């Protein structure tokens, strides 16, 4: 099977701190539904910056900064799309960028 990088963008944090557990439970259930296909559940990420080819730095991560990542195994890009469809981030208004990770 191939490896796919899921890069999460956007999404809204829970409106109330009490809702955090429900959000984390939803992520746990989604990862659980994929079983061994989850190679690395990843992490949320903090503020980012971009290094340009001239060496200059731009804060803010560009037009669509990443909010987290995971590494998933799937049989094809279509299978990766199906796996991504259950992600709780999508219900929170976020998006998922999917790219095949090439073995070197």
Question: Could you say what each language-model-derived stretch is?
Answer:
Residues 1-104:
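Conserved, structured core segments of small domains
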């Amino acid at each position: 099977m191939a490896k796919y990088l899921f890069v999460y963008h956007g999404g809204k944090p829970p409106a109330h701190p009490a809702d955090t557990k429900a959000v984390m439970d939803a992520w746990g259930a989604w990862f659980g539904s994929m079983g061994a296909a989850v190679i690395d559940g990843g992490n949320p990420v903090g503020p980012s910056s971009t290094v340009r080819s001239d060496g200059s730095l731009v804060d803010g991560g560009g037009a669509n900064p990443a909010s987290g990542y995971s590494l998933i195994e799937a049989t094809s890009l279509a299978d990766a799309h199906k796996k991504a469809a259950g992600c709780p981030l999508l219900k929170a208004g976020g998006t998922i960028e999917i790219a095949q990770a090439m073995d070197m």
